[in-house]
Swiss-Prot record:
Homodimer. The RNAP catalytic core consists of 2 alpha, 1 beta, 1 beta' and 1 omega subunit. When a sigma factor is associated with the core the holoenzyme is formed, which can initiate transcription. The keyword Transcription applies. Keywords: DNA-directed RNA polymerase, Nucleotidyltransferase, Transcription, Transferase. Signal peptide: none annotated. This is DNA-directed RNA polymerase subunit alpha.
Length: 339
């Protein structure tokens, strides 16, 4: 069909090369080629903007320091003034496994440096740059702080982090929630067969460690994909020409769908991935107790998954005869366009 030529005849990348440096959790370079001429800039710019603005992350939103009423203060025995301390607090890198606001506390007596690693965290919170210096204490000086940590996206100025019922002494902090710290891309010419006029896109992504560069790029691509879907006003003609279905299976073919297509939260999706749960059929055979024993998997994730499964007429703890089939990967591909 002519309509399909609009996208089927365009070249798609057949190579995706990922190169990591000394710290693969923070820096990676991804090369995609070949691309149609002009698509390198189109995709590179879109991915860069989404990476920097739209990924969820955690950050400190406010701090309370004993004996301090506002940020234009000084603390006896502390070399930095409160303004400098707040600037340092802004750069604390945090990984949070919960969407709910959390509190962290710090208490230390001098002399010596006060670092992010001195902060007492709860189980759902992890400090990713513990060597970050917050302030310096003289001999005999003491400091106590309480931090509020929340999740969000992009940059939120301090004034928007001040609650209406803020107590005296609460200092709101500018929050940079994005786990992505730097993105750059370049477009070069590459060849496809005898055609020397194709694009090669090279993207370098740096994160604070809360998410790997590869995952960050994948999340950004998914965001763009979801945003563009609303503009597609037709069904894929290929579905109309699909081959007849294979013989009837002893279970619901929808169980061959992969769990990463369920649009779960990042935390829930990562927990399933870490537990090697690939297909919906794998998931629904798990009991609630088994799921709650999964590392970093809490009640909120459980309720989210139960709600998604209920919408499909499924639930946890189901017994599925004939699961998993021996040729599960082949079956999943054959039923992909139908379910």
């Amino acid at each position: 069909m002519v309509i399909q030529k609009n996208w089927q005849e365009l070249i798609k990348p057949n190579k995706l090369q990922v190169t990591t440096g000394d710290d693969p959790k923070r820096v990676a370079t991804v090369v995609a080629e070949p691309l149609e001429r002009g698509f390198g800039t189109t995709l590179g710019n879109a991915l860069r903007r989404v990476l920097l603005s739209s990924l969820q992350g955690a950050a400190v939103t406010s701090v309370q320091i004993d004996g301090v009423l506002h940020e234009f203060s000084s603390i006896p025995g502390v070399r930095e003034d409160v303004t400098d301390i707040v600037l340092n607090i802004k750069t604390i890198a945090i990984r949070s496994q919960t969407d709910a606001p959390k509190r962290m506390t710090l208490r230390k007596t001098g002399p010596g440096l006060v670092t992010a690693g001195d902060i007492g965290t709860v189980g759902d919170i992890q400090i990713l740059n513990p060597d970050l210096v917050i302030c310096t204490l003289d001999d005999g000086a003491e400091i106590r702080m309480e931090f509020t940590v929340a999740t969000g996206k992009g940059y939120v100025p301090a004034e928007r982090n001040r609650p209406e019922d803020a107590p005296i002494g609460l200092i709101p902090v500018d929050s940079l929630f994005s786990p992505v710290t730097k993105v750059s891309y370049r477009v070069e010419t590459t060849r496809e067969g005898q055609d020397l006029d194709k694009d090669k896109l090279t993207m370098t992504v740096e994160t604070n460690g809360a998410v790997s560069p590869e995952d960050a790029l994948a999340y950004a691509a998914r965001i763009i994909q979801d945003q563009l879907q609303v503009f597609v006003n037709f069904e894929d003609p290929r579905k109309e020409e699909a081959a007849p279905l294979a013989p009837q299976l002893p279970f619901n073919p929808a169980l061959l769908k992969k769990v990463d297509e369920l649009e779960l939260s990042v935390r829930s999706a990562n927990c399933l991935k870490n537990d090697n749960i690939v297909y919906i059929g794998d998931l629904i055979q798990k009991s609630e107790g088994e799921m709650l024993r999964t590392p970093n998997f809490g009640r909120k994730s459980l309720n989210e998954i139960k709600e998604v499964l209920a919408g499909m007429g499924l639930h946890l703890g189901m017994d599925i005869p004939g699961w998993p089939p021996e040729n599960i990967e082949d079956l999943a591909k054959r039923f992909e366009e139908h379910y």
